[in-house]
Amino acid sequence: MGNIKELQTSLANKIAAGEVVERPGSVVKELLENALDAKATEINIEIKQSGIESIRVVDNGTGIEEDDLKLVFHRHATSKLHEDSDLFHIRTLGFRGEALASISSVAKVTLRTCTDGQSGHEIYAEDGAILEQKPAKAKKGTDILVESLFYNTPARLKYVKSLYTELGKITDIVNRMAMSHPNVRFTLTSDDKVLIKTNGSGRTNEVMAEIYGMKVAKDLVHITGDTSDYHLEGYVAKPEHSRSNRHYISIFINGRYIKNFVLNKAIVEGYHTLLTIGRYPICYINIEMDPILVDVNVHPTKLEVRLSKEEQLYQLIVQKIQEAFKDKILIPHNDENKLYKKNKVLDVFEQQKLDFENRTASNPPAEKPDEETDRVNENSDTQAFQTNEQTSENGSDASYQAGQRAVLQDLEGNTKNSEGLFDSEATSNEAASAEIESSEDDVRETEHAKPHRRVPYMEVVGQVHGTYIIAQNETGMFMIDQHAAQERIKYEYFRDKIGEVTNEVQNLLIPMTFHFSKDEQMIINQYKDELDKVGVHLEPFGSHDYIVNSYPVWFPKEEAQEIIQDMVEYVLEHRKVDIKKIREEAAIMMSCKKSIKANHYLRNHEMADLIDQLREMEDPFTCPHGRPIIISFSNYELERLFKRIM
């Protein structure tokens, strides 16, 4: 008798559910995708015990026809695909027909639905099978209640993280869905406490204000761009709002949130020297394209995709982000001590603290990304974000919105300054929208003005510890890192100086020796002609070694061997020779070594000359490594610090 047997349907469904339903957040994601595909304009999510006890998703979409109810919990039953060719033209978020079957295999599911002009129906399912179906009163749309998740798979239940972690996962999913569908009103309630509430205005920056706070929202820069294949639109935050991990990078393709290492890299490259190593931006980017150019049928979670013409899209993202910051004023303001303000908010609203970067309540990271670079440090020490409790006994929307806006403003330091840019009394959604619109007007004015000098005029006051220059003008005080300032000046000088291609080489009396493994040698040999074209002639020397007898004259003598090593490593990683990138790295290296260091005292006229040179730079706000050069203190901030203004 043979050993191979066909699995029972219930067991096969549980195995398949392991890929689709990893945690409570997976259930929320699948149900939200179904609601959005049903053209819902309002979606309410209610969870108990972080989704372990129950998850309820109510939408006002098209609903499910009575004749379709008998198939709704069958695996691979869907209304979104009909033939093979449809798989290459997917515009819906769901398409596999696995979600409800997988959920009902590991939970108890009650589904109530009603289509336009028809009577409502209710069905109840366990273990993937419908146990009851009956008529029921229902509004147009679908109401799904998922209870006792993993009740029949205790091994899965024990791998569920803490309630705060799971709540964080759910909040993250809703946040991203709200960003990609700003025209939909989302409400997330956890144990009767409202955590997220969007107004469905259709403005992505308003949703981002709810998630990240008004301070970040005011510093969002709109980007847009087109090629023959792609339409790109999004918002990128100024570099001063950078974070310690990639979690705050949100990329969407045709409204679908995805994870893609190459596109993440393009975004970071777009910021270029505006970010320090290990810092990543807050941004939202949506790319519209013909579905035939993207394969979303890679993994059941639908987070991974394969892209056609990926390099073209990479270049578009880099270009548009660089253009966005080209003429912006990027001097960061000093933040006042946030501890006092946080404590004040806690006293007033008695909130439950959920750490923003520890993946608890608001905008937490996905814990199981497929690229290691997307993982979030559990112990990240960046700023916290407080979720909102209703502040009145009747839980009215007005009270909630007022409390929410006050919390967001206090936590993000969004208080009134001398220019009147911040209004601590603007606690309604309407006021927030007006502030965002005003900020966008300022951006448009700046773009039209395009000033040549982006650093304002300032007078030197003195120097601190031979490291920082103190300067002032009528608006306030400035601190300048003298090493970073001269590093930027020399970087742009060397970058331009070595920017012209030359075939002149420096011959060596004693050749340089380089060692590479066999697999690396195969790649080097493949690209040897390209290396020769840029003046790097690698000659085999033994079984694993190469020698170099000359190098281009623009290589700094002291760093020539290091530059050649970096050049070859770049080829090994990227499978191409990028002379522009190599020359830039050389310029960074030279500028750092030749700039004045800390504890070097300067005369006043030397400091003034340094500032004047900095004002002429193309990008005067960060050194080539991304560290800030200038920090400003407005007159208002100084008066607040000394309690002259309360």
From Swiss-Prot:
Residues 356-380, 415-452 are annotated as: Disordered. It comes from the Bacteria. CDD domains: HATPase_MutL-MLH-PMS-like (cd16926), MutL_Trans (cd00782). One of its GO terms (molecular function) is mismatched DNA binding. GO terms for biological process: mismatch repair. Gene3D superfamilies: 3.30.230.10, Histidine kinase-like ATPase, C-terminal domain (3.30.565.10), MutL, C-terminal domain, dimerisation subdomain (3.30.1540.20), MutL, C-terminal domain, regulatory subdomain (3.30.1370.100). One of its GO terms (cellular component) is mismatch repair complex. Keywords: DNA damage, DNA repair. Disulfide bonds: none annotated. Residues 424-436 have a biased composition (Low complexity). This protein is involved in the repair of mismatches in DNA. It is required for dam-dependent methyl-directed DNA mismatch repair. May act as a 'molecular matchmaker', a protein that promotes the formation of a stable complex between two or more DNA-binding proteins in an ATP-dependent manner without itself being part of a final effector complex. Belongs to the DNA mismatch repair MutL/HexB family. This is DNA mismatch repair protein MutL. It comes from Staphylococcus carnosus (strain TM300). The gene is mutL.
